[in-house]
Amino acid sequence: MSLKSETRVNTSTLQKIAADMSNLIENLDTRELHFEGEEVEYDASPGDPKAQEGCIPFSSIYNTQGFKEPNIQTYLSGCPIKAQVLEVERFTSTSRVPSINLYTIELTHGEFTWQVKRKFKHFQEFHRELLKYKAFIRIPIPTKRHTFRRQNVKEEPREMPSLPRSSENAIQEEQFFGRRKQLEDYLTKILKMPMYRNYHATTEFLDVSQLSFIHDLGPKGLEGMIMKRSGGHRIPGVNCCGHGRACYRWSKRWLIVKDSFLLYMKPDSGAIAFVLLVDKEFRVKVGRKETETKYGLRIDNLSRTLILKCNSYRHARWWGGAIEEFIRKHGADFLKDHRFGSYAALHENTLAKWYVNAKGYFEDIANAMEEASEEIFITDWWLSPEIFLKRPVVEGNRWRLDCILKRKAQQGVRIFIMLYKEVELALGINSEYSKRTLMRLHPNIKVMRHPDHVSSSVYLWAHHEKLVIIDQSVAFVGGIDLAYGRWDDNEHRLTDVGSVKRVTSGLSLGSLTAASVESMESLSLKDKHEFHKKEPISKIVDETDMKLKGIGKSRKFSKFSLYRQLHRHHLHNADSISSIDSTSSYFSHCRSHQNLIHGLKPHLKLFHPSSESEQGLTRHSTDTGSIRSVQTGVGELHGETRFWHGKDYCNFVFKDWVQLDKPFADFIDRYSTPRMPWHDIGSVVHGKAARDVARHFIQRWNFTKIMKPKYRSLSYPFLLPKSQATAHELRYQVPGAVPAKVQLLRSAADWSAGIKHHEESIHAAYIHVIENSKHYIYIENQFFISCADDKVVFNKVGDRIAQRILKAHREGQRYRVYIVIPLLPGFEGDISTGGGNALQAIMHFNYRTMCRGESSILEQLKPELGNKWINYISFCGLRTHAELEGNLVTELIYVHSKLLIADDNTVIIGSANINDRSMLGKRDSEMAVIVQDTETVPSVMDGKEYQAGRFARDLRLECFRLVLGYLSDPSEDLQDPVSDKFFKEIWVSTAARNATIYDKVFRCLPNDEVHNLIQLRDFINKPILAKEDALRAEEELRKIRGFLVQFPLYFLSEENLLPSVGTKEAIVPMEVWT
């Protein structure tokens, strides 16, 4: 045998002896051992560096360890534990069984106070455990855990406290006070000795754990070791054998009860194994009849039936009563039935803010993410990792979503993202790419996708809510995904080609002055257009590459070919920071060709000094665009940054997204096709309302973790809701928020959130607000599919609108309804040929709600109002125009909002469309917030003085000014939304005038002149003024004000727009469209 192998044998033998010795000592019976009078060991300072912080951070819930580990942090640093024996309960018996004394011990540790009940025999068992531990710690066993314990123990001369030896039965009634004092002193001394205080037997005796003293988890609740039975989960579509007793498995777990949830942990690993939220179905039952278990305890909520087993019936009764009492005291709000059937309570004095369009919304999300210290929760229907949250881009990649998340993850923030897992054949949002991209950024970023379509049998419904939650204290709720195409501002631009101007080669960067800037040779749109007609793209690209190889030598290099290359070349390097403005696409192209790098690099120079790396972008001092300069052999080219880069420049009616794994490559030609502007609404709430949003996210996350086996590993942790008791402690507050009454609403069901009864509180809130509105309602929505026939459509929103108008007419009341929806549904299709089948199907149900068929709003109104319905309700869309490459172009503005404003005092903002998918609860999952003003400002309503809510009125005015074109012109008074002057002379008149001008100039579709497909073919073949006479067209377009246009109610009114038999859309169930 070699020396090396002999050493290996000796080492393994030593390890075996050490393990045997450790097991022997752990199982040592020390009942006869008494080490009275001996010195004890004492550690004056905590060993865990985290303990120096003075409190246990909330993030420690993700770092729990096995209960017997020596270095876990259970207690608050530098904070003593005070023990007091409050009372003694004496249980007597007529039999020969000795009387039992039960001591109630109150413990205080910092802000936390709790009670435990112990018999004297428990003290004796506890004392023996400590004696065994003391003997064990003296033996130098060569194991890592034992060595750590010994190294962290310092000897100090102190006597080991001893328990009274006299029997409980020998104590007289008058001696109880003395016994209480003895036990109290014993505990006080033990708890002053870190060696014993941190021992797992002590923490179990005191009913404490690593999660006991975390401030944001609320008051110290009930804790203790129990036996837990497997099963009881409600997982839709899965029929497991959990109902047969043979399938049950019992496991030892540490149960923790908090103010709004309970959980249990695995003692050996410290892992949180399940979280059960308190809700209105929360019940605790005791007994064999209820639990089918001797000494059983049953806990129910909307998601699970949990069966526990105790040591005795009395123990089970105590657990049941204590849990109910604690939850009633600290979590009563979660047990109640709330308004609209919502899972969330109405919260007073809650800070809230609205957003019109994504510019401010994205900026505030970016700023809030920067302030995150513990957690970021995100859930979206679609998420694009490479989008920029702040634009124009002037700080490189700093505000790109994936870069923000990576930066925060590196700082220790835990990031949890849930994405809708689409049916890939039906949708091209490529959530797998999003997940893969985000997960590889950092281990602190966890992404789940749901649902699994086969196992859950969910093919038709989607997770549609859009939420961003920061530290469970600030929550963004609305209709805006963090995805391509969503960013927009109040200008709703149609074009984004940037601009390039050339300065003569004699000018140097240093000598560039205001005068020289004015003398730049500019490329007009017309010149560029003429050039594009003459030069094919392939020739330009080839010529540019050829000239670049000899840059600085040849003077034949064309400014046009460089311009073309700067603006039209597709990016190949998706990770390049430089891929985000008009000139940097050219740089990226050159970097991908190694033979050009060395020749070109000396000639590329930024006009402004950059704070980023070579790949970074320049900063600038204005908000209009980033001025760039490229030094070439033909002088200086100065450009303005783009707002939409690569896939972000989109027009999904013209063409749906493709190749999402190439984020900075254009997929439509921005020189010939205008983008589709995006109009949307968002909100942010703080405090208790934000806690409610986080609670919904946590419920969905934990449900998905249980349901999908791939997420059951410890790398995907269970999430815990923070306590409402600490919700007022805001570490960050979004600027501009105002106080109001706020309640969260949702659409949720078994498939989406794992709950027993579906919730449709958004639908109930819409109905309530419409029925109780007194003056007006203003609706912006992506869809308008309602008016129930109880066969195909079931939501009642449209019916309630019609009934409210009829009520106003009968009472002689002035009442207005404003409906703003997209002129066309957001599906790919050529409307000049009638549109695609999906587009037509949505058009059918929109028209069925508004004006076609006996169930429609107008058909419900006409029998009583005739044509006077026009005085009560207005249907509108949004449209804009621009010049693109020398041509006049127009495009609808896609209304994606989910907004309801009533009476300038109530607002609903969320992700829910007005259709059955969003409203019924059993279908798509949705989230919304209802805000009711408590702060008022003087206003006018129906010609009379009126106290309008600050939140609702300001939002309504912002929407009106935007769509009517009065954002920068306060000449018209928009205060009174009900008066005839506003409704007829401003709103209806502006919409009609704009629609007429657009029809005259562009012959827009949809159009009221077109009733069938034959008329449609004739309509599109007629000459268009914008092409025939551009000057006259421009003169007409100058009369346009704002974006508002009348909705064409009679477009294709003679056609059946439902999918034709034989098409794939006709095979799909009708519920998909409604």
Swiss-Prot record:
GO cellular component terms, A-Z: endoplasmic reticulum membrane; endosome; Golgi apparatus; Golgi membrane; late endosome membrane; perinuclear region of cytoplasm
Enzymatic class: hydrolase
Domain PLD phosphodiesterase: 459-486, 891-918
Tissues where this protein is expressed: Expressed in kidney, lung, and at a much lower levels, in brain, liver, heart, testis and spleen.
An individual GO BP term: defense response to Gram-positive bacterium
Cellular compartment(s): Cytoplasm, Perinuclear region; Endoplasmic reticulum membrane; Golgi apparatus membrane; Late endosome membrane
A Pfam cross-reference name: PLDc_2
Bilayer disposition of the protein: Lipid-anchor
UniProt KW Ubl conjugation keyword: no
Residues anchoring lipid (S-palmitoyl cysteine): C240, C241
Record text on activity regulation: Stimulated by phosphatidylinositol 4,5-bisphosphate and phosphatidylinositol 3,4,5-trisphosphate, activated by the phosphokinase C-alpha, by the ADP-ribosylation factor-1 (ARF-1), and to a lesser extent by GTP-binding proteins: RHO A, RAC-1 and CDC42. Inhibited by oleate.
Major location (coarse): cytoplasm
InterPro entries per record: PH-like_dom_sf, PH_domain, PLD-like_dom, PLipase_D/transphosphatidylase, PLipase_D_euk, PLipase_D_fam, PX_dom, PX_dom_sf
Coiled-coil region list: none
Phosphoserine: residues carrying this PTM: S499, S561, S629
Enzyme Commission code: 3.1.4.4
Alphabetized UniProt keyword annotations: Cytoplasm, Endoplasmic reticulum, Endosome, Golgi apparatus, Hydrolase, Lipid degradation, Lipid metabolism, Lipoprotein, Membrane, Palmitate, Phosphoprotein, Repeat
Family matches, as PANTHER family: PHOSPHOLIPASE D, PHOSPHOLIPASE D1
Role noted for this protein: Function as phospholipase selectivefor phosphatidylcholine. Implicated as a critical step in numerous cellular pathways, including signal transduction, membrane trafficking, and the regulation of mitosis. May be involved in the regulation of perinuclear intravesicular membrane traffic.
UniProt similarity note: Belongs to the phospholipase D family.
Protein name (record): Phospholipase D1
Organism: Mus musculus
